[in-house]
Amino acid sequence: MLPIRKVLGSTDFSIAGHPAVLAAGELAGHFGAELVLLHVVQPAPTTPLVPPERMVVLPSGSETEKYERDEENRSLEELNRLVVERLPKGLSCRTLVRVGSAAEEIVRLSESEEVDLIVIATHGRTGWRHLAFGSVAEKVVRTATRPVLVVQSPSQVPQDSKQ
C-alpha cells in the first residue's frame, strides 16, 4: 500500500470545494499524516480585459502588490478558520497561500512539499463554462506527478448513482 505521510488539500472557499477539504482532513487523520491546506489567489489583472474605449484604470505595481498581499492575508485567515471549524481536532495541519494559476501552484507545491496525495474538488462545470474557465482539477490530474483524488460535491453526483 502507498504510504501516506503528507496530504495536500486545496480550496477555493466555494461550497463545492468543502467536501474535498473534509476528505483531505479525514484521510490525513486516518493515516496520521500531515495536512497541507492551500488556497491560491489569482493575481491582479495587469493587462486590459476590455476594448480601449471602455478601459478602466488598472492598478499600478504597488497597488497590485497591496491587493495581492491583502488577498493573501484574508485567505490565510479564512484557511485558519476552516481548520478550526471544520477539521478534526489534533490534526497536524499547515495552511499556505500562493499567488498564481491555481493548477500550476497546486502541482508546484505538491512537488516542493513532496506530498503523497493531492485532494482537490471538482465543480462539475460543463458546456461553455468548462470551455471558458477550464478545470483546475483536470489540469492538476494531467500535470501532477503525485496521486490525485478528485472529490465531487454531493450535488454533482448523478441521482441514479445515489443508491
Regions found by a protein language model. Give the residues of each.
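Structural beta-alpha unit
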Residues: 1-2, 30, 42-44, 73, ...
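Short, well-ordered secondary-structure micro-motifs
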Residues: 20, 47-50, 107-108, 131-132, ...
